[in-house]
Design a protein with these regions (language model features):
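Carbohydrate-binding surfaces of carbohydrate-active enzymes
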Residues: 184, 189-193
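Catalytic-core regions of glycoside hydrolase
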Residues: 1-185
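Generic structural signal marking isolated hydrophobic packing positions
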Residues: 81, 193-194
Length: 194
């Protein structure tokens, strides 16, 4: 129906209702993560389509209960892992040694980066709890972009203003993030020129 589609998603639902049958539970126990059963399924789909659709990739979320990388199964070359940072603290950088909330995600991105050739990040770039007031986390966003690049992230989706006219300077934040994604290591002077 859409021959130009190059990425299609096979992902979990946006909830905590994962399969608890005996077989899936055994796989997840062996893998040390609920991502084990999901990734084995996604890999089978990827294997089925690779000959007929060699330019198409399967995208799947590493999100909430599947965020932790599996111990055994690795994503196929035509599988994209989209690691979501929803549980993180967005006022502190992922490398901040004083932020215990971000420590688990930091570990997860490092582990996914070791096994995935195509790691993308779904990052949350504003404060959804207090959406409209100023949330000056630009320094954190810049640090995190560098951290993502250092840990083999090949793409990023920054979710910010999605449900109202705008949060704090939403359009400017989106523009600056777009510029920074082209070069996550650009200097502050370069960034300030935009």
């Amino acid at each position: 129906e859409n021959p130009d589609c190059k990425i299609t998603s096979v992902s979990q639902n946006d909830n905590q209702n994962y399969c608890k049958c005996e077989k899936c539970a055994a796989v997840d126990e062996e893998e040390g993560s609920h991502a084990g059963s999901l990734l084995r399924f996604v890999n089978r789909v990827a294997d089925e389509i690779k000959d007929d659709y060699p330019d198409v990739s399967i995208d799947t979320l590493a999100y909430q209960y599947t965020r932790k990388a599996p111990l055994i199964t690795k994503p196929r070359d035509n599988v994209i892992i989209r690691l979501c940072s929803i549980e993180c603290c967005f006022a502190h950088g992922l490398n901040d040694p004083d932020c215990e909330v971000n420590a688990a995600f930091k570990h997860d991105i490092i582990e996914w980066g070791k096994i995935s050739k195509r790691l993308y990040i779904w990052d949350y770039v504003t404060d959804f709890t207090y959406y409209i007031p100023p949330f000056p986390n630009w320094r954190v966003l810049r640090e995190n972009l560098e951290f993502f690049a250092d840990n083999h992230a090949a793409g990023m989706y920054p979710e910010g203003n999605y449900n109202s006219v705008s949060g704090e300077f939403g359009e400017l934040r989106a523009y600056l993030l777009a510029r920074a994604m082209w070069d996550p290591y650009m200097s502050d002077d370069e960034m300030n020129s935009y």
